[in-house]
């Protein structure tokens, strides 16, 4: 416990890179510190993690974390649990959870071990994982879909050990003096700006979006594709846009530093994912920005997105039809955007998320 009587939480980053899961840990660590909790960060050897977390002011230690049976990592985790007097070890993938459980078994100090599950996959049912399910104090799923698919393989796990807490993101802090989007890309004032923001990967559906844009290329709009991916795949997308005759209609912006500022200057956000997402944070970011957002229904999106903006079919023709309706009707865009912001501020607020996750930390059952 800290001097303010709050728990000390060890947060374990799931990878050496930086993505939605790492941002989840960063945001939670920042808020926990502000509320008086003790926070200790753990990650694999990673300069990215070290650089990104420097501004938090939390202590960071880096372990190998290569194997669930890595003795060096287990012993380091044991010593860390004891030295910081940890009350909670919060992990974000199974491999790290094994390390936390084995470390706790070796230690006189017995912190709660909590796992947040960020993926949509059935549970494994072998002996080792049955051990993990019995020993982990709580498994938090970021969506009902993630929980349902996990339990579909009938793992041996107590119902009280499983809970759903929808992801959230803190209200964005807009930077002042940012670039005006239309000026940067030479977009006329009346041209509708459609945007995708996120990782460029086949499962994200950007190719479907390009095909839909090609069906609308005689209309007055510009599609901004913001984000990065593997260079070969990025080039494939650029080549596809060129082959579809979308020169002047599609702009690949590359990586953006201030995504919230970007989102607030577009008219329509599109998240055309073709893979099952446990919880699409990009959708929530567009909602926070008060933008009309069009997305597919193949992940957890139906749990938090209005049905009117969900596409039940990922084909380009259907996406084209919906884009055309929203693009042509400014009043509809504004109505959808206002409803999205209201949902983000109420049911999906970071305040709500933080209350739920800290209630799990405090729960003594």
Locations of regions flagged by a protein language model:
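Short hydrophobic beta-strand element within catalytic cores of glycosyltransferases
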Residues: 41-43, 291-295
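A conserved, positively charged/aromatic
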Residues: 105, 111-144
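A conserved mid-protein helix/loop that constitutes part of the nucleotide-sugar donor-binding site
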Residues: 19-30, 192, 196-215, 223, ...
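Acidic anion/phosphate-binding donor-loop and adjacent secondary structure
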Residues: 68-72, 148-152, 160-161, 166-184, ...
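A charged, aromatic-enriched C-terminal amphipathic alpha-helix characteristic of glycosyltransferases
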Residues: 20, 173, 331-362
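Active-site donor-binding acidic/aromatic loop of nucleotide-activated sugar
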Residues: 232-235, 247-256, 262
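Glycosyltransferase donor-sugar binding loop
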Residues: 42-48, 197, 222-235
């Amino acid at each position: 416990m800290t001097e303010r009587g709050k728990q000390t939480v060890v947060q374990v980053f799931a990878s050496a890179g930086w993505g939605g899961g790492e941002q989840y840990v960063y945001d939670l660590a920042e808020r926990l510190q502000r509320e008086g909790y003790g926070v200790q960060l753990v990650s694999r050897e990673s300069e990215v993690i070290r650089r990104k977390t420097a501004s938090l002011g939390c202590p960071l230690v880096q372990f190998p974390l290569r194997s669930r049976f890595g003795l060096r990592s287990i012993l380091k985790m044991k010593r860390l649990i004891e030295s910081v007097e940890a009350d909670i070890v919060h992990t974000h993938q199974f491999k790290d959870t094994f390390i936390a459980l084995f470390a706790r078994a070796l230690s006189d100090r017995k912190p709660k071990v909590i796992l947040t599950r960020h993926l949509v996959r059935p549970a494994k049912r072998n002996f080792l994982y049955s051990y993990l399910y019995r020993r982990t104090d709580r498994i938090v799923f970021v969506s009902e879909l993630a929980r349902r698919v996990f339990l579909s393989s009938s793992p041996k796990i107590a119902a009280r050990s499983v809970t759903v807490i929808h992801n959230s993101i803190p209200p964005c802090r807009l930077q002042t003096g940012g670039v005006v989007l239309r000026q940067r890309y030479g977009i006329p004032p009346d041209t509708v700006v459609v945007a995708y923001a996120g990782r460029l990967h086949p499962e994200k559906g950007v190719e479907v979006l390009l095909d839909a844009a090609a069906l609308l290329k005689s209309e007055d709009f510009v599609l901004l594709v913001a984000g990065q991916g593997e260079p070969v795949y990025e080039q494939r997308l650029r080549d596809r846009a060129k082959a579809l005759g979308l020169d002047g209609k599609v702009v690949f912006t590359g990586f953006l530093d201030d995504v919230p500022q970007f989102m607030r200057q577009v008219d329509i956000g599109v998240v055309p994912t073709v893979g099952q997402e446990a919880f699409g944070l990009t959708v929530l970011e567009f909602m926070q920005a008060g933008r009309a957002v069009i997305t597919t229904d193949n992940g957890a999106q139906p749990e938090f997105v209005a049905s009117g903006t969900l596409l039940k079919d990922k084909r380009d023709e259907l996406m084209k039809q919906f884009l055309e309706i929203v693009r042509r009707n400014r009043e509809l865009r504004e109505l959808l955007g206002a409803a999205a912001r209201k949902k983000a501020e109420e049911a999906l607020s970071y305040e709500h998320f933080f209350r739920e996750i800290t209630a799990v930390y405090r729960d003594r059952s």
